[in-house]
């Protein structure tokens, strides 16, 4: 996992906590998309593009899994 991905995960977990979500599932039940949220938060914070670190779908899916696990551990 790259530093960019770690930063995006940390920003997302922090946002979920600050907005009253107790887990990733709480957010997903609202119809939210964790990866899209991570992309948006990362861009807002750094003006960077999270998608630029993903060379293929497998890499993006790995990020999505790591993000979900981190958000479940809130």
Q: How does the language model describe each region?
A:
Residues 3-49, 59, 63-71:
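Amphipathic alpha-helical segments in structured regions that serve as interaction surfaces
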